[in-house]
Amino acid sequence: MVPPREDVTVRIVCERRRTAGKEARPPPSAKPTPGNTSSHPNAKETHRSNEPFFRLYTKQSHRRSIMASTLCVVLGSASSTDPAAISAATMTDAAAKTIHDAIYESLELVVVASELADVYDSMELSRFTKILSPNATVSVSVIGDATKSLSPIHTSFLLAGLANNSERRNADGSRTLTATRRNNTTNSVATLNFASNNNNGNDLLIDEDNLLTDASNLLGAPPSMSAAATKSGDDCSGRAPCDDCTCGRAEGAKEGNSEQPKEIKSSSCGKCSLGDAFRCASCPYLGKPAFKPGEEHLVLDLQDDF
């Protein structure tokens, strides 16, 4: 049942204030001179009492909407077998001719396929939803060979808030698109699924043993340091000794630093790094490529193994 619409009628009444019966009035012979309003002691008060004022009356009248079954609108040069169909040139004209006091259960629009882009406006269909009841059906019949895109009709359904239901192709090549108005009620209730609140306190507990595991081996030494530590028998994974070391690793590190550096081979000419063109006959790097001074240990060993 559609609730009745309330129309409010406003009536403005202009009245004049009337002075009290006991109020003294000036005699007819005593007329105030222009510019002088003090000829009578109550002249100013009498002028105020005759000022008009307004009263606002409201009257509410209930007018029930007319419930109708189907509204048929023919656009452009299309035709319909419904004698009560409304003919209009465009969607804008059809919206202006519609009886807005009635509520319809279904709306039928008829348009020729060749005139779809000219007479059908996607924005105007939303104006018809005001006269449709909840769950009302809206159908658009495209007469003729509807080989062109029907995207304007689908767009109008979307802008009007309609749910697109179906599209039917007839034997003569015409198409009928159907949509339904959603029943959006203000008293509808949506169910919210909340997660179960398990306040047993176990989520706040942390296992200390899990914090000590290193599954990704992030706490270990780099591979190069580990290989060097394994080769030298170091059990500290190549890390520097502690300041208060008691395992003897600090003494071993000091002895390792006190070792003499390896002797670097060189000749008397001092031009070993420049290449064979500058080296002498007794150069130990004869036959090897040139290198930077101090990088003798990086020189490739190009000698034969035989």
Swiss-Prot record:
[2Fe-2S] cluster binds at residues 236, 242, 245, 247. One of its GO terms (cellular component) is mitochondrial intermembrane space. Residues 191-218 are annotated as: Linker. [4Fe-4S] cluster binds at residues 269, 272, 280, 283. Residues 1-25, 252-265 have a biased composition (Basic and acidic residues). Its cofactor is [2Fe-2S] cluster; [4Fe-4S] cluster. GO terms for molecular function: 2 iron, 2 sulfur cluster binding; 4 iron, 4 sulfur cluster binding; electron transfer activity; metal ion binding. GO terms for biological process: iron-sulfur cluster assembly. Residues 59-190 are annotated as: N-terminal SAM-like domain. Residues 236-247 are annotated as: Fe-S binding site A. Keywords: 2Fe-2S, 4Fe-4S, Cytoplasm, Iron, Iron-sulfur, Metal-binding, Mitochondrion. A motif (Cx2C motif 2) lies at residues 280-283. Disulfide bonds: none annotated. Component of the cytosolic iron-sulfur (Fe-S) protein assembly (CIA) machinery. Required for the maturation of extramitochondrial Fe-S proteins. Part of an electron transfer chain functioning in an early step of cytosolic Fe-S biogenesis, facilitating the de novo assembly of a [4Fe-4S] cluster on the cytosolic Fe-S scaffold complex. Electrons are transferred from NADPH via a FAD- and FMN-containing diflavin oxidoreductase. Belongs to the anamorsin family. Monomer. The C-terminal domain binds 2 Fe-S clusters but is otherwise mostly in an intrinsically disordered conformation. This is Anamorsin homolog. The lineage of its organism: Eukaryota, Sar, Stramenopiles, Ochrophyta, Bacillariophyta.
